[in-house]
């Protein structure tokens, strides 16, 4: 679920996702189009693509099972669809952490008008 995704991002980055990522670049937050603007925006693009491949459950609403072991998230549970959502969220949270040093505030509250280029395929 989006609440679990928020939790993962906060634990991985120490940042509040609603302020730091919800309105960043062309792909972070609702929707997405154009060309990812930087590495952080690409994390969101890849996450959107990952959600797009999930069938049989709702990535934004369905609650999955995960645990933390030695600072890493481990996706669990018996439902393969929910496990897939968890993996999408986990990989995006890791991506955000890995790209913290290139986060650029100029892409925060980025205007959709700047995202007019043709979108690349997933």
UniProtKB/Swiss-Prot annotation:
Q: What is its EC number?
A: 3.1.1.4
At the top level of its lineage, which domain of life is listed?
Eukaryota
- List ligand-binding residues for Ca(2+): 27, 29, 31, 48
Write out the annotated subcellular location: Secreted
- Residues of the active site: 47, 89
Free-text remark on how the cofactor is bound: Binds 1 Ca(2+) ion.
Which terms does the UniProt entry file under GO BP? arachidonate secretion; lipid catabolic process; negative regulation of T cell proliferation; phospholipid metabolic process
Instruction: List, alphabetically, the GO terms of the cellular component aspect.
Output: extracellular region
**PROSITE patterns associated with the record:** PA2_ASP, PA2_HIS
The protein's required cofactors = Ca(2+)
UniProtKB keywords: Calcium, Disulfide bond, Hydrolase, Lipid degradation, Lipid metabolism, Metal-binding, Secreted
Q: Name one GO molecular function term.
A: phospholipid binding
Tissue pattern of expression reads:
Expressed by the venom gland.
Any one Pfam family match given in the protein's UniProt record, by short name:
Phospholip_A2_1
Disulfide pairs here are 26-115, 28-44, 43-95, 49-122, 50-88, 57-81, 75-86
The catalytic activity, as recorded, is: a 1,2-diacyl-sn-glycero-3-phosphocholine + H2O = a 1-acyl-sn-glycero-3-phosphocholine + a fatty acid + H(+)
Give the family this protein belongs to, as stated in its UniProt record. Belongs to the phospholipase A2 family. Group II subfamily. D49 sub-subfamily.
Which miscellaneous remark does the UniProt record hold?
A: Is not myotoxic or lethal. Lacks anti-coagulant, platelet aggregating or anti-aggregating activities.
What is said about its interaction partners and assembly?
Monomer.
- What is the stated purpose of this protein? Acidic phospholipase A2 (PLA2) that only causes a mild edema, when subcutaneously injected in the mice foot. PLA2 catalyzes the calcium-dependent hydrolysis of the 2-acyl groups in 3-sn-phosphoglycerides.
Protein name as annotated: Acidic phospholipase A2 BlatPLA2
